[in-house]
Regions:
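Reductase modules of NAD(P)H-dependent flavoproteins
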Residues: 98-202
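A short, basic/flexible loop-to-alpha-helix module at the beginning of a structural domain
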Residues: 52-64
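Histidine-anchored nucleotide/phosphate-binding helix
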Residues: 78-88
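Ferredoxin-reductase
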Residues: 1-46, 102-103, 129-131
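Phosphate-handling active-site elements
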Residues: 88-96
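Polyanionic, low-complexity intrinsically disordered segments
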Residues: 72-73
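Structural motif
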Residues: 66-68, 96, 160
Protein backbone atom coordinates (compact mmCIF):
# COMPACT_ATOMS: atom_id res chain seq x y z
CA UNK A 1 0.00 0.00 0.00
CA UNK A 2 1.35 3.45 -0.95
CA UNK A 3 1.13 6.49 1.29
CA UNK A 4 -1.91 7.78 -0.60
CA UNK A 5 -3.75 4.53 0.12
CA UNK A 6 -3.22 2.99 -3.32
CA UNK A 7 -3.35 -0.80 -3.01
CA UNK A 8 -1.95 -3.50 -5.24
CA UNK A 9 -2.08 -7.25 -4.70
CA UNK A 10 0.89 -9.53 -5.34
CA UNK A 11 1.40 -13.23 -4.82
CA UNK A 12 4.07 -14.33 -2.38
CA UNK A 13 7.00 -16.10 -4.03
CA UNK A 14 8.69 -17.49 -0.93
CA UNK A 15 7.51 -20.68 0.75
CA UNK A 16 5.83 -20.69 4.18
CA UNK A 17 8.81 -22.43 5.80
CA UNK A 18 11.20 -19.68 4.69
CA UNK A 19 11.83 -16.89 7.16
CA UNK A 20 13.54 -13.53 7.01
CA UNK A 21 11.62 -11.59 4.39
CA UNK A 22 8.93 -11.41 1.75
CA UNK A 23 9.71 -12.20 -1.89
CA UNK A 24 7.57 -10.63 -4.60
CA UNK A 25 7.93 -10.86 -8.38
CA UNK A 26 6.89 -7.49 -9.81
CA UNK A 27 6.82 -6.66 -13.50
CA UNK A 28 7.30 -2.99 -14.38
CA UNK A 29 4.19 -1.66 -16.06
CA UNK A 30 5.05 1.80 -17.51
CA UNK A 31 2.37 4.21 -16.40
CA UNK A 32 1.35 2.03 -13.50
CA UNK A 33 1.20 4.02 -10.27
CA UNK A 34 2.70 1.32 -8.07
CA UNK A 35 5.28 -0.22 -10.39
CA UNK A 36 6.51 3.19 -11.56
CA UNK A 37 7.10 4.01 -7.91
CA UNK A 38 8.85 0.70 -7.21
CA UNK A 39 11.15 0.85 -10.22
CA UNK A 40 11.78 4.61 -10.32
CA UNK A 41 11.42 6.40 -7.00
CA UNK A 42 11.26 3.85 -4.18
CA UNK A 43 14.30 4.03 -1.94
CA UNK A 44 16.07 1.30 -0.02
CA UNK A 45 14.57 0.84 3.46
CA UNK A 46 11.46 2.79 2.45
CA UNK A 47 8.51 1.72 4.58
CA UNK A 48 5.50 0.17 2.87
CA UNK A 49 2.36 -1.15 4.52
CA UNK A 50 1.46 -4.78 3.84
CA UNK A 51 -1.75 -6.66 4.40
CA UNK A 52 -1.98 -10.44 4.30
CA UNK A 53 -1.29 -13.12 3.46
CA UNK A 54 -4.66 -13.58 1.81
CA UNK A 55 -6.12 -16.06 -0.67
CA UNK A 56 -6.41 -19.83 -0.92
CA UNK A 57 -3.64 -20.74 -3.35
CA UNK A 58 -1.82 -23.60 -1.65
CA UNK A 59 -1.18 -27.28 -2.33
CA UNK A 60 -3.98 -29.52 -1.06
CA UNK A 61 -2.20 -32.10 1.07
CA UNK A 62 -5.24 -34.37 1.30
CA UNK A 63 -4.78 -35.53 -2.30
CA UNK A 64 -2.29 -37.86 -3.96
CA UNK A 65 -3.25 -36.91 -7.52
CA UNK A 66 -0.48 -35.83 -9.91
CA UNK A 67 -0.23 -32.06 -10.22
CA UNK A 68 -0.09 -29.84 -13.30
CA UNK A 69 1.20 -26.34 -12.53
CA UNK A 70 0.43 -23.61 -15.06
CA UNK A 71 2.15 -20.22 -14.85
CA UNK A 72 2.11 -17.24 -17.18
CA UNK A 73 4.63 -14.44 -16.74
CA UNK A 74 5.12 -13.45 -13.11
CA UNK A 75 2.44 -15.97 -12.23
CA UNK A 76 5.49 -18.12 -11.56
CA UNK A 77 5.75 -16.44 -8.13
CA UNK A 78 3.12 -18.42 -6.16
CA UNK A 79 3.97 -21.57 -8.14
CA UNK A 80 7.54 -21.19 -6.87
CA UNK A 81 6.25 -20.87 -3.31
CA UNK A 82 4.02 -23.93 -3.66
CA UNK A 83 6.78 -26.09 -5.13
CA UNK A 84 9.47 -25.05 -2.67
CA UNK A 85 7.14 -25.92 0.19
CA UNK A 86 6.36 -29.29 -1.41
CA UNK A 87 10.05 -30.08 -1.88
CA UNK A 88 10.78 -29.01 1.70
CA UNK A 89 8.14 -31.45 2.96
CA UNK A 90 9.46 -34.23 0.69
CA UNK A 91 6.15 -34.48 -1.12
CA UNK A 92 6.31 -37.45 -3.51
CA UNK A 93 3.47 -36.47 -5.85
CA UNK A 94 4.23 -35.95 -9.53
CA UNK A 95 4.61 -32.26 -10.42
CA UNK A 96 4.81 -30.89 -13.96
CA UNK A 97 5.30 -27.14 -14.40
CA UNK A 98 4.32 -25.39 -17.63
CA UNK A 99 5.62 -21.81 -17.61
CA UNK A 100 4.36 -19.64 -20.44
CA UNK A 101 5.94 -16.37 -21.52
CA UNK A 102 6.13 -14.21 -24.62
CA UNK A 103 9.91 -14.27 -25.04
CA UNK A 104 12.83 -16.15 -23.53
CA UNK A 105 13.75 -13.07 -21.48
CA UNK A 106 10.35 -13.27 -19.76
CA UNK A 107 11.35 -16.63 -18.24
CA UNK A 108 13.21 -14.57 -15.68
CA UNK A 109 14.12 -17.46 -13.34
CA UNK A 110 14.36 -20.30 -15.84
CA UNK A 111 17.49 -21.71 -14.19
CA UNK A 112 15.59 -22.43 -10.97
CA UNK A 113 12.98 -24.91 -12.29
CA UNK A 114 15.68 -26.45 -14.47
CA UNK A 115 17.68 -27.07 -11.30
CA UNK A 116 14.62 -28.51 -9.55
CA UNK A 117 14.22 -30.98 -12.41
CA UNK A 118 17.77 -32.21 -11.78
CA UNK A 119 17.25 -32.49 -8.03
CA UNK A 120 13.74 -33.99 -7.87
CA UNK A 121 12.78 -37.07 -9.87
CA UNK A 122 9.06 -36.30 -9.42
CA UNK A 123 9.31 -32.86 -11.06
CA UNK A 124 9.33 -31.90 -14.73
CA UNK A 125 9.63 -28.42 -16.28
CA UNK A 126 8.16 -27.39 -19.64
CA UNK A 127 8.76 -23.76 -20.72
CA UNK A 128 6.54 -22.44 -23.52
CA UNK A 129 6.99 -19.26 -25.58
CA UNK A 130 4.15 -17.59 -27.46
CA UNK A 131 6.29 -15.07 -29.37
CA UNK A 132 9.59 -16.86 -29.89
CA UNK A 133 11.84 -15.05 -32.37
CA UNK A 134 14.74 -16.25 -34.48
CA UNK A 135 17.03 -14.02 -32.43
CA UNK A 136 16.45 -15.98 -29.23
CA UNK A 137 17.27 -19.32 -30.90
CA UNK A 138 14.46 -21.03 -29.01
CA UNK A 139 14.38 -24.81 -29.36
CA UNK A 140 11.53 -25.49 -26.93
CA UNK A 141 7.72 -25.50 -27.05
CA UNK A 142 5.78 -22.64 -28.62
CA UNK A 143 2.19 -21.44 -28.62
CA UNK A 144 -0.31 -20.91 -25.82
CA UNK A 145 0.83 -22.48 -22.57
CA UNK A 146 -2.47 -24.13 -21.65
CA UNK A 147 -2.65 -25.76 -25.07
CA UNK A 148 0.78 -27.29 -24.49
CA UNK A 149 -0.70 -28.94 -21.40
CA UNK A 150 -3.61 -30.26 -23.45
CA UNK A 151 -1.27 -31.72 -26.06
CA UNK A 152 0.62 -33.64 -23.38
CA UNK A 153 -2.34 -34.49 -21.14
CA UNK A 154 -5.52 -34.91 -23.20
CA UNK A 155 -7.06 -36.66 -20.17
CA UNK A 156 -6.86 -34.64 -16.95
CA UNK A 157 -9.64 -36.48 -15.15
CA UNK A 158 -7.27 -37.80 -12.48
CA UNK A 159 -5.13 -34.67 -12.00
CA UNK A 160 -5.12 -31.48 -9.98
CA UNK A 161 -4.25 -28.19 -11.68
CA UNK A 162 -2.80 -25.09 -10.02
CA UNK A 163 -2.69 -22.04 -12.28
CA UNK A 164 -1.53 -18.46 -11.87
CA UNK A 165 -1.30 -15.59 -14.30
CA UNK A 166 -3.39 -13.21 -16.36
CA UNK A 167 -7.16 -13.78 -16.20
CA UNK A 168 -7.42 -14.61 -19.90
CA UNK A 169 -4.90 -17.43 -19.45
CA UNK A 170 -6.60 -18.77 -16.32
CA UNK A 171 -10.08 -18.56 -17.84
CA UNK A 172 -8.96 -20.32 -21.03
CA UNK A 173 -7.29 -23.09 -19.03
CA UNK A 174 -10.30 -23.65 -16.78
CA UNK A 175 -12.71 -23.75 -19.72
CA UNK A 176 -10.66 -26.08 -21.91
CA UNK A 177 -9.31 -28.36 -19.19
CA UNK A 178 -12.79 -29.04 -17.82
CA UNK A 179 -14.75 -29.26 -21.07
CA UNK A 180 -12.16 -30.94 -23.31
CA UNK A 181 -9.79 -32.80 -20.98
CA UNK A 182 -12.24 -33.96 -18.33
CA UNK A 183 -10.67 -32.15 -15.38
CA UNK A 184 -13.13 -31.96 -12.46
CA UNK A 185 -13.80 -28.26 -11.87
CA UNK A 186 -13.20 -28.68 -8.13
CA UNK A 187 -9.64 -29.82 -8.91
CA UNK A 188 -8.72 -26.50 -10.57
CA UNK A 189 -7.12 -23.96 -8.22
CA UNK A 190 -6.12 -20.50 -9.42
CA UNK A 191 -4.49 -17.24 -8.40
CA UNK A 192 -5.51 -14.81 -11.13
CA UNK A 193 -4.28 -11.25 -11.51
CA UNK A 194 -5.03 -8.39 -13.88
CA UNK A 195 -2.34 -6.82 -16.04
CA UNK A 196 -2.91 -4.70 -19.14
CA UNK A 197 0.29 -6.09 -20.65
CA UNK A 198 -1.05 -9.62 -20.25
CA UNK A 199 -4.22 -9.11 -22.25
CA UNK A 200 -3.51 -11.95 -24.71
CA UNK A 201 -3.06 -15.66 -23.97
CA UNK A 202 0.46 -17.09 -23.85
Amino acid sequence: MLRDGTRRSYSLANAPYQEGGIELHIRHMPGGVFTDHVFSTMKEREILRFEGPLGTFFLRDDSTKPVILLASGTGFAPIKSLLEQAFFKNNTREFVLYWGARTKADLYMQDLPEQWALEHSNFKFVPVLSDATSQCNWQGRTGFVHRAVMEDYPDLSKHQVYACGAPIVIDSALRDFTTVCGLPEEEFFADSFTSMADSTPR
